[in-house]
Each structure stands twice: as C-alpha cells, then as structure tokens.
Amino acid sequence: MQPFVLYNSEQRKKVEFVPRKEGHIDMYVCGMTVYDYCHIGHARVMVAFDYIIRFLRSQGWKVRYIRNITDIDDKIIKRANENGETIQQLTTRFIDAMNEDAANLGCLAPDEAPKATEYIDQMQNMIGNLVNKGAAYPASNGDVYFEVTKFEKYGRLSGRKLDDMQAGASERIDVEVEKKHPFDFVLWKHAKENEPSWASPWGNGRPGWHIECSAMSTCCLGNHFDIHGGGSDLMFPHHENEIAQSEASTGEQYVNYWMHVGFINVDGEKMSKSLGNFFTIRDVMEKFHPEVIRYFIVSSHYRSPVNFSDVALKEAKTSLTRFYHSFKAYQQVYGQTTTEALDQSFIERFNNAMCDDFNTAEAMAVLFELNKELNRAVKEEQADQATVLYSTLRHLTNILGLVQHNVDDFLKSDIGQDALALSDAEIEDFIQQRVDAKKAKDFAKADSIRQSLLEQGVVLEDTRQGTVWRRAD
C-alpha cells in the first residue's frame, strides 16, 4: 500500500493522506438533486471519484464510499408541479436515469446511496441539538436558521470572512428579514401550501439543503471521517455550511480532507442552463460512445477546468481507439492470453502518477508509452514480452475503467468510430484477396491492396502467424 498525497481544499495544498483507521478510507461525495437528467458536469464528478476509488482499492485500501441523493428540494417540487406528477414519481424516474447514466459511464455503484427523505428524523435531531446549543434559532415565520456568527471558524474552507462578504454573493443565499445575519442559512423550512412537509418541534416543514448532507454523512460514516468530495461549485456555501453545522453540533472535526472536482467549460465559459450551453450525459451519448466521454474526463487532472467541445471528444475518441486497436492486434495473434507477470516499471510509474493527487494526465502518458511498446512487441513477434505488456496494459486500463468493452463491438459501433467506409468484414475480404494475389505471385496487386487499405486508414502487418490489421491512429 503506497503512500499518496492529495490536494486538500481546506489547506490549499497537497498533503500526505493519513487515515483515521489503518488501511481504511471513509468517503462521502455530494450527489445529485434528482429533478432532471444528469449533465456532463455531474458526469465529471461521478467518473473522477470512480477512478480515484478504483485506484485506492487496487492499492489495497478498504474504501467505504457514500454518495447521497437529494430527493426533496425547491427545484424538485417546482418540476413535479409543472409535470403534473408526484414528487416520488419524478424522483424515482430520475434516480433510475442517474444510475443508468453512471453505469453507462462505467462507474461502480457507491456502497450506500442515502436519500434525504429517509433521514428526516436524524436531520431534526441535529437541528434540535444546534438550537439547544445556541448555534441555531427558530424564526417567527417557522423557519430555523443556523447563526453563522456563533461558529468562529466560518469561512475556513472557502477562505472567506464574514465581514468581507456581501449578501447575495451566491444564488443559494437569500436576504430575509427573519435572519440575524445575511449569511445565516436555513436548517428547517416552514410548510407551504401544496408542498410536502413533516411534523417537527418547530412546526410542519422540511429540511434545508445543507443539513441533509451533514445528517446523512454522519449517520453513514460517523461524526468525523476521512474525505468529503464534490464539485468545485459546492465549496461555498454548501460545504462551508456543512462544516459549520456539523462541528457546532458534534463538537468534533467533521472531515480531514476536502476534494473538489474542477468545472467543465464550454467555449471558455462555465456550462450553465442560463447560457444555453448545457449538455446532459444523454445528449452527448447520442453522438459519442459513453466510454469516450469517460476517457475525456479521465485524461485531464480532476482539479483542472476542462473545455468541453465536439473537437475535444473526437480527440478523446481517437486516443481511446488506439488502445482498442492495440488490443485487437494482440488478440489477432495471441487471443486472450494473459500472464500474472506484469511489467513492474510501468506499474511503478503509473502508481507514482496516481499517488500524486491522482494525476491521471501523467498516468495516461505512461499508458501511451506502454501501448507503443505493446505494438512494437506484437509487430516484432516477441510473444513473451507482448503478453506481459498486454497484461500490464489491461490491468492498468481496468483501474481507470477504460477499454472495458469487447474490442470488436467497440470498433464496429457507429459511435465507436466515424462510420468508417470499410467494415471489418470488408477489410478481412481484402486481406484474403491480397493473400491470394501473393500466392499467385501477383505482387503488384498485393502491394496495391495494401496501399489502398492504407489510404482508407487501415494498416497491415505481416507476421509469421499471418496478416494482422489495425485502423491507423
């Protein structure tokens, strides 16, 4: 189990990870508010924590991964009313869609996926504790607010100071006369007509957004756990508020390490519905294989902002297809033969990259070099070395959740390649014509077939076992 460093958003630097319990990592990631289909920003968060967890488990860590579901929220209520359906009908439909999208992207299911509506009692207990400690107060309108001035460390995650902040800095914050301070945030919302509500000591109502994650995370992982993650947009106010209410309630440190995934931009601007540059995962999957989307996400460091475009996805498809071509070239000669003997130099370099704040950009550079060596070994008919390199590459791509599909199925799919002019069957037919031409000593025809295929993006390689082919990179 190799030590690793990660960027802790709270400390604003990379630090060595020290577990609370030897060999174990407890991780909570903020999930989706299920009122619509997941967008490509959600995909990045899902995929990033998926490959992080896959890598940690490959290193021997026992990771407990919790990702919540917000199934009660203003947007959910509004959308259900617009659609003329119940909240449960709406949320069930979009939870199913979310899980389907995640599976298509190759994401493993979390160990638990708690729903907010299943933890109302625990939320009320935490709110009651905060009121009793004087950190929260009921307002005359039936709401209950957290009093930010009672938590001295408020702002430590985002680096903000209350005195410097202005009300309205976030779309999640409303200036209301019931508040003692503009940044006091709601823990319990009083019931409104035709909205779902639960009985509470403060009257009928429903929980605020921030208290949901504090209650679910501490119920699932305890008052103090290792890693909390989410998108960069959640750092303030959501994660800041989680820290305040959790630590004010329990008196313990809430989380040791905070991880935040970078934004996805479109033409240099943050993706958003208001700008009209918003893409759901399903929108993108109509044009690109889901593993191409995963590759696009994996190929950049999780903290770096990335620019989303068709061009970027086409580049991702080209790069991913190289691995599939290499696997096909190997399998044409050696079948599915693998070995437990792996190339430790490539393993070490890959692990070193991933242990440096999960640097997938550097890890992918290692895989491309390994892929090049595999192609060389296959071409030079070095069977033993080819098998070791193939086995190593398969092992490492598995860790990142890449090259997970049947090679022929991926390469034949319309979204796996640009509907290339020649099908696999047509290529095989041309190869047989070339073999027949060589047997007839018609070398001019054989060379012509090779050149014609090359011009159509197909490379032939003659080996002792026969002719193998691959599509050009």
From Swiss-Prot:
Binding site for ATP: K273
Catalyses which reaction(s): tRNA(Cys) + L-cysteine + ATP = L-cysteinyl-tRNA(Cys) + AMP + diphosphate
Motif mapping: 'HIGH' region: 32-42
Binding site for Zn(2+): C30, C213, H238, E242
Stored InterPro entries: Cys-tRNA-ligase, Cys-tRNA-synt_Ia_DALR, Cys-tRNA/MSH_ligase, Rossmann-like_a/b/a_fold, tRNA-synt_1_cat_dom, tRNAsynth_Ia_anticodon-bd
Assembly behavior: Monomer.
HAMAP family: Cys_tRNA_synth
Name of this protein: Cysteine--tRNA ligase
Organism, as annotated: Acinetobacter baumannii (strain AYE)
Gene responsible for this protein: cysS
